[in-house]
Structure formats: structure tokens, C-alpha cells
Design a protein with these regions (language model features):
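Inter-motif core of Ras-like GTPase G domains
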Residues: 171-192
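Beta-strand-loop-alpha "switch" segments that mediate conformational coupling across diverse proteins
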Residues: 229-275
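Intrinsically disordered, low-complexity terminal tails and inter-domain linkers enriched
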Residues: 211-218
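Walker A/P-loop phosphate-binding motif and the immediately C-terminal alpha-helix
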Residues: 43-93
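Conserved beta-strand segments of the P-loop GTPase G domain that flank and frequently precede/overlap
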Residues: 51-52, 81, 133-136, 161-164, ...
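Phosphate-binding/switch loop-helix module in NTP-utilizing enzymes
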Residues: 125-176
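Phosphate-binding loop that captures ATP/GTP phosphates
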Residues: 74-130
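Extreme N-terminal, non-catalytic leader segments
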Residues: 1-56, 99, 109
Length: 291
């Protein structure tokens, strides 16, 4: 990949500086996942989504919950999946209706002989209508990977939204990153230092998963959506505008999630209690990565 795109990292937006939203060319959708409908014909389905952090404190869990909540609100069977290395607080933050004692591992091996138990019976639940799968610290066994998890969820008829946490380079995430059906959302907090670390992350993605012929807006980098999460009051968009100016055409899209007092509490998230502006931001994000 031509490295000219990374020169912006030597610059820092000045106080009061704000570039307008440039017209952006979108990277093509890589593939459409098919799901058999009531008519018996295959129809395009919502793409699975993997949310990972460009650094710690990026808001991957709340972003995954917000996206999943909006997919669920549209009527799709959706499950938010803990795809971190040793377990996160995904279910503790999102299961405002029912917290199941069944972990991802218990579901995955529930019937023995490498056959998963019925997914619906094992899910934690949110009042938004989505299910949640939390994982315990134990490693996946019997050579299972998150590709195994992905296939089992797809067979159950659910759309997964994975909370991958950080760092993105974790080996357990590779099967999901290698699957071009899965849309990648890269989240960072609205801080200059977090924006500057994107260079390392995007270069790593290109080195590990990019193709030799990938040009501007192509490959995994071109199919990546960057999300800037505002975790302090205010609507300062200088970081987002700066990234749009310098990454225009290189990534799929750059979106912002506004500050929301309900999310800032760090407690149980009830989707219906999110501000209208926050939910609109999740819908815009979802529209950008949807099939």
C-alpha cells in the first residue's frame, strides 16, 4: 500500500481548526452474506460486524451494544458476542433483562461432540430484543476458534456483533479479521494521541491481511469503518474532521458517536435510555457497513 496516506500523523489539528466533511468514495462491499428466507430463496442479510479498539478505552463494548441494539430494533435476530481474549463486561453492561449463567464456551460445547447447544436457550437478554453471549476466561478448546463460533451463530439464524476489545493484533481475532464477510469497525476515543496510533493499526492490518494489488480504498483497510467515541461533554469534531481530511478514500467511512450521559455512567446500558442523537449515530454507522 502506498504510504502517503499516513503523513497526516505528523500533524495535529489546531484550536478552532475544522475541515469540512469531504465527499468520500466508499470502499466496495466485499461480499454479501446470504440467508434463506421464508420463500426458500437466498436473500442478502445484514453483515456480521467486528468492533475492535485502536487503543484501550475506545468504547468497543458500548459501540457493539449500540450497533446490536439498532439491528435488533430493525427486527433481525441479533447477538452481541464477547470476542475478547479472556472475557469482558459485555453482558454485565448490556443484559438489562436477563443475565444467563451460560457462557459462550458452555454453549459452544453444550451438546458434546463439538456441537453447540440451541443458541436461543443460552443467551443473556436485553430489553432491546438482542441476545448476548459472554465468555469466561478459559481458552476455547478442541481446536475451536471464533470461526467455529461464527459458523454456529450463522447456522442458528442470528446476526453477530463481536466486541473484540483491544488490541486488534490478538491471535484469537485473526479468524474474524480474515473473513471478508465480516465488517470491521475500528473504534478510538476522541483524543489526538488515539488518532495518531491509527497509523500503526492500519499498517498492521494492511501488512497482515492486505493483498499486493490493494490500492487506495481497497483491501481490509478500505473496508474498515473508523468510529470516534466522544467520552467527555461537548461536540468538538476536530479529531474526526482531521481524520476525514487525511484518510478520505482510504477507509470506508469515519463516524462519530456523541457523548451520552447514560453511557458515561459506566453502568448497565439500557438501549431505550440512550439519547436520540446517540441512536441516530449508531444507525448511521450501521447503514455504512450494512449489506
Amino acid at each position: 500500500m502506498d504510504q502517503d496516506w499516513s503523513r497526516w500523523l505528523d500533524e495535529v489539528p489546531e484550536e478552532g481548526e475544522s475541515s469540512g466533511r469531504a465527499a468520500r468514495s466508499k470502499a466496495p462491499v466485499v461480499r454479501l452474506r446470504k440467508r434463506r428466507g421464508d420463500s426458500g430463496e437466498d436473500a442478502p442479510a445484514q453483515r456480521p460486524i467486528l468492533v475492535v479498539g485502536g487503543c484501550g478505552g475506545a468504547g468497543t463494548t458500548t459501540t457493539a451494544l449500540g450497533i446490536a441494539g439498532e439491528i435488533g430494533a430493525a427486527g433481525s435476530q441479533t447477538v452481541a458476542v464477547d470476542a475478547t481474549f479472556a472475557g469482558s463486561d459485555l453482558a454485565l453492561r448490556g443484559a438489562d433483562e436477563h443475565l444467563s449463567p451460560i457462557s459462550l464456551q458452555s454453549w459452544l460445547y453444550g451438546r458434546g461432540d463439538d456441537e453447540a447447544a440451541p443458541l436461543k436457550e443460552c443467551l443473556s437478554l436485553a430489553t432491546s430484543g438482542i441476545g448476548l453471549l459472554w465468555r469466561d476466561p478459559a481458552p476455547l478448546r478442541r481446536r475451536a476458534t471464533y470461526l467455529t463460533v461464527s459458523r454456529a451463530i450463522d447456522e442458528a439464524g442470528y446476526t453477530p456483533v463481536y466486541d473484540g476489545g483491544s488490541p486488534i493484533a490478538g491471535r484469537h481475532l485473526r479468524p474474524l479479521l480474515e473473513d471478508a464477510d465480516i465488517a470491521l469497525v475500528l473504534a478510538i476515543p476522541a483524543r489526538a494521541d488515539a488518532a495518531n496510533r491509527l497509523r500503526v493499526t492500519l499498517e498492521w492490518l494492511d501488512d497482515q491481511f492486505g493483498g499486493q494489488g490493494d490500492g487506495q480504498g481497497g483491501g481490509i483497510v478500505g473496508d474498515t469503518t473508523i468510529v470516534i467515541s466522544h467520552q467527555l461533554p461537548g461536540n468538538d469534531s476536530r479529531i474526526a474532521d482531521h481524520l476525514r481530511e487525511h484518510l478520505d478514500g482510504w477507509v470506508r467511512e469515519i463516524n462519530e458517536i456523541p457523548y451520552d450521559p447514560h453511557l458515561a455512567r459506566g453502568e448497565l446500558v439500557r438501549h431505550s435510555n440512550l439519547a436520540a442523537e446517540t441512536r441516530r449515530a449508531y444507525r448511521r454507522l450501521l447503514a455504512g457497513v450494512a449489506s
